[in-house]
């Protein structure tokens, strides 16, 4: 605990920190400091650094409080000086907010406390000073509610129960016959505070703390503690945020949006976070505090006239009713709106990115509480980057780096078919949050979404009155989210947008009964397990399952892909087994096929019969008869691939799986095979038993099969070469690469290459023509990697099969790792699932060694990977640094890999 600065003050257009100090002050603290420095109106406060978070977990609560006390007391005096109020004073009490602020934005994952410093004396002083006792008691009840939840652990007893404080509020409203919190009187609020405190005493056995300093230390430590809560841990895991970063804590003088009809609070975006449209938008609530907007307990109104009119059209509200009941901030407080509009524009121009801002209007005065780069959908991400490039706000390289590769996946998600929508039954309408389409069975609790996915593989629709941060895991596992309350800036909408999940919020017609597990809406009853569909673009909710179609990609997407190609070094190919897959990959910009799995061609129609005939053959002659039937089929398949790729390289892998995968293992299937093949059942059973292996992954497969039965390699080589020559004859150039799988010894490869070359020469002689082709190998056996110098004497290219290379290097079975992987991740034994993200220290080192040794033998050796890692951004980055020529992935991952390759090249420079 060396003598270092742990607290940084800000206020009155001065700050000890700045926007570049995110690592130390967190995103919120750094931006609060920066907004002060550029003249934005921000309530004064101070930020406790992220380093203290680490000390909190190392030394404990009491040690951290004693360590912080002098600096915090000094910083509090600075706030007192700037506000003219005093913390803990009985006449002019200073009230503060306590908020988390990690280096990376984690919306709703950690805790916030408002109105801290309130007690029985302070509430009377605030009432007297403002002449507004209702406001004072409303602020007091909010503080007790938030502090009770965050610091004292006042949570629902079971998942069917509601928040204990909300239950008390609902009882009070029912007792008074009112609908909204804002309809409660001062006396009602006094009774709420009394009942809140009684509930705290009953559940915790302790009195609610009244000393402001005790409250402050409790809140600071609770915010640090929230860094390791379950939802924050999960969010960090999903977004690759290291636990060691920690969170900062910002303490700020309160400004109040709940002082009456001339006060408000809101959240806004400088551009549309769902679509990317250059339209200032957001939501606000009159006579409310910030948590009311994001918590979704009240459905807010729109900030701009344009946004309000669009909302009214979507909700089928007339213009007359909109103006009377749901006016925009632009109409209600035009001068404040004008200032807010100028500030948002200033912030976007200054930070050169779309801004998410929180603000409060206290008695007609605008205050900014936060700004950050806004979370956005994949579609919005691309549009904003391309628009800002066209506007001259950012350059090409920044535009490319501004787009996260993984989020491109959202653009490729299916959308509802318009014809299907026309015939669908709309039940309610809500507010469209992230666009897209989602369909699935209804569940009402987060853990049930997890269970449905685990049991059925089907993603459900999570239906909630409003979501809370505790629902994060269920939201992740759901296909979409539907809420009865909340707006487009509520927790559900913001988190869903960040995840790329479809969400419809604020569907107020829904009557949700958690205990009965039903929804009542417009005469319909929807039970748990019934299917519904969500339209995230319109806010409509449909009964049943609605058909979907492939998404239409925008011109901005094409422009981004062009830029990615301009700045990347690493090429991107696709794993494709059919002409349809190849055409899709080509449309996404793939520069070849990096893996064509020939065995996938054997499972259709008469093909499986021919391969089974080969398996049942008693000798080579019999096998050749069966293979002759497969030859024209394979040749036709290859012709389709070569035509689809139109001159780009195509890597064809020879037969890889063991033969037992082509025969049935159940009695019914074996009987059907016997009848179809016209042989006794006993022969089928005997053959299946003879093919069985204890460890088929390491068994009779790949080049071992080709060397045992060279006639298989001959047939495939002939089909490939003949197909290439046929396509070449049509005027389409062909670049074919023949890949031998599972090589661990250069002699295995040499035997296979000799068969391929001999077969090719026979075809050339028959056709009186030639084509160029290459023979290479998959590096998936660790021995192949460490003897790559020998293998490169034969191989003209290497393709790393990282799926099997990971299995053999780590000794993990991909099919069985699920039994212990969660424990290994939790204990930190593994940082990531090695089958999702390449293990750089183990598998990665083998790849580097193989590339180095291989090119030592053959200088121009082409190297790529074709495992699932080829479409994972951080693995693509590794491949760039390792000097590979290309990565290959599934067609729908091609855009992601292309953008990741550009990121790797730009970040290296």
Where are these regions (language model features)?
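Structural motif
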Residues: 463-465, 484, 506, 575, ...
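Conserved alpha/beta-domain cores
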Residues: 99-100, 553, 563-909
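Nucleotide/phosphate-binding sheet-loop regions of phosphoryl- and nucleotidyl-transfer enzymes
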Residues: 1-424, 458-461, 468-473, 479, ...
């Amino acid at each position: 605990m060396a003598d270092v600065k742990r607290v940084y003050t800000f206020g009155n257009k001065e700050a000890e920190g700045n926007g570049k100090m995110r690592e130390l002050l967190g995103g919120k603290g750094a931006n609060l400091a920066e907004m002060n420095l550029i003249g934005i109106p921000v309530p004064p406060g101070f930020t406790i650094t992220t380093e203290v978070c680490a000390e909190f977990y190392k030394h404990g609560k009491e040690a951290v409080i004693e360590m912080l006390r002098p600096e915090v007391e000094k910083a509090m005096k600075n706030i007192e000086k700037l506000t003219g109020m005093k913390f803990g004073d009985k006449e002019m009490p200073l009230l503060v907010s306590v908020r988390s602020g990690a280096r990376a934005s984690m919306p709703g994952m950690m805790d916030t406390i408002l109105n801290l410093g309130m007690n029985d004396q302070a509430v009377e002083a605030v009432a007297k000073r403002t002449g507004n006792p209702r406001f004072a008691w409303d602020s007091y009840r909010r503080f007790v509610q938030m502090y009770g939840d965050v610091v004292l652990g006042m949570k629902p007893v079971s998942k069917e129960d509601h928040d204990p404080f909300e239950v008390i509020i609902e009882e009070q409203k029912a007792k008074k016959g009112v609908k909204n919190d804002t309809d409660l009187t001062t006396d009602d609020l006094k009774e709420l505070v009394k009942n809140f405190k009684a509930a705290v005493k009953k559940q915790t056995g302790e009195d609610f703390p009244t000393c402001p300093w005790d409250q402050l230390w409790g809140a600071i430590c609770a915010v640090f503690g929230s860094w390791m809560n379950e939802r924050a841990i999960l969010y960090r895991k999903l977004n690759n945020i290291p636990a060691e970063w920690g969170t900062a804590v910002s303490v700020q003088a309160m400004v109040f949006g709940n002082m009456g009809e001339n006060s408000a609070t809101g959240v806004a975006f400088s551009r549309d976070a769902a679509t990317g449209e250059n339209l200032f938008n957001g939501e606000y609530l009159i006579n409310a505090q910030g948590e009311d907007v994001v918590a979704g307990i009240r459905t807010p109104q729109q900030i701009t006239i344009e946004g309000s009119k669009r909302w009214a059209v979507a909700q089928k509200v007339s213009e007359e009713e909109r103006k009377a009941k749901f006016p925009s901030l632009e109409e209600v407080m035009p001068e404040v709106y004008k200032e807010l509009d100028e500030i948002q524009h200033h912030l976007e121009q200054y930070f050169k990115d779309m801004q998410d801002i929180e603000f409060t209007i206290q008695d007609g005065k605008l205050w900014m509480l936060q700004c950050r780069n806004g979370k956005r959908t994949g579609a919005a991400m691309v549009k904003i980057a391309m628009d800002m490039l066209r506007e001259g706000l950012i350059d090409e390289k920044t535009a490319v780096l501004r787009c996260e590769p993984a989020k491109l996946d959202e653009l490729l998600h299916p959308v509802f078919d318009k014809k299907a929508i026309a015939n669908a039954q709309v039940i309610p309408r809500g507010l469209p949050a992230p666009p897209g389409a989602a369909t699935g069975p209804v569940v009402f609790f987060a853990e049930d979404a997890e269970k449905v996915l685990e049991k059925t593989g089907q993603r459900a629709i999570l239906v909630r009155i409003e979501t809370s941060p505790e629902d994060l895991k269920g939201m992740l596992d759901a296909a979409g989210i539907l809420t009865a309350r909340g707006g487009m800036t509520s927790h559900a909408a913001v988190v869903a947008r960040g995840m790329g999940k479809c969400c419809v919020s604020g569907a107020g017609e829904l009557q949700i009964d958690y205990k009965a597990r039903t929804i009542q809406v417009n005469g319909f009853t929807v039970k748990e397990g019934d299917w519904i569909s969500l339209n995230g673009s319109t806010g409509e909710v449909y009964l049943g399952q609605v058909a979907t179609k492939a998404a239409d990609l925008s011109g901005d997407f094409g422009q981004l892909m062009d830029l990615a190609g301009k700045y990347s070094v690493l090429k991107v190919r696709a794993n494709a087994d059919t002409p349809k897959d190849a055409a899709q990959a080509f449309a996404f910009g793939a520069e070849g096929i990096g893996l064509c799995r020939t065995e996938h061609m054997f499972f259709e129609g008469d093909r499986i019969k021919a391969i089974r005939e080969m398996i049942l053959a008693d000798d080579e002659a019999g096998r050749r008869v069966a293979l002759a039937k497969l030859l024209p089929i394979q040749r036709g398949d290859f012709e389709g691939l070569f035509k689809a790729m139109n001159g780009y390289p195509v890597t064809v892998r020879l037969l890889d799986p063991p033969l037992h995968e082509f025969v049935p293992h159940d009695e019914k299937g074996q009987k059907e095979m016997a009848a179809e093949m016209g042989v006794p059942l006993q022969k089928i059973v005997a053959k299946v038993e003879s093919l069985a292996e204890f460890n088929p992954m390491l068994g009779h497969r790949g080049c071992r099969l080709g060397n045992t039965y060279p006639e298989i390699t001959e047939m495939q080589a002939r089909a490939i070469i003949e197909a290439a020559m046929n396509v070449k004859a049509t005027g389409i150039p062909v670049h074919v690469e023949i890949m031998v799988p599972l090589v661990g010894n250069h002699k295995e490869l040499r035997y296979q290459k000799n068969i391929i070359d001999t077969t090719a020469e026979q075809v050339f002689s028959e056709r009186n023509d030639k084509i160029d082709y290459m023979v290479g190998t998959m590096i998936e056996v660790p021995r192949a990697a460490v003897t790559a110098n020998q293998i490169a004497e034969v191989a003209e290219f290497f393709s790393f099969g990282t799926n099997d290379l990971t299995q053999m290097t780590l000794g993990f079975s991909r099919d069985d790792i699920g039994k212990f992987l969660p424990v290994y991740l939790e204990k930190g034994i593994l940082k990531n699932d090695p089958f999702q993200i390449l293990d750089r220290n183990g598998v990665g080192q083998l790849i580097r060694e193989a590339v180095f040794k291989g090119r030592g033998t053959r200088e121009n050796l082409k190297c790529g990977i074709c495992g699932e890692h080829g479409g994972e951004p951080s693995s693509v980055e590794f491949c760039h640094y390792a000097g590979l020529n290309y990565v290959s992935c599934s067609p729908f991952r091609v855009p992601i890999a292309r953008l990741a390759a550009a990121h790797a090249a730009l970040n290296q420079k």
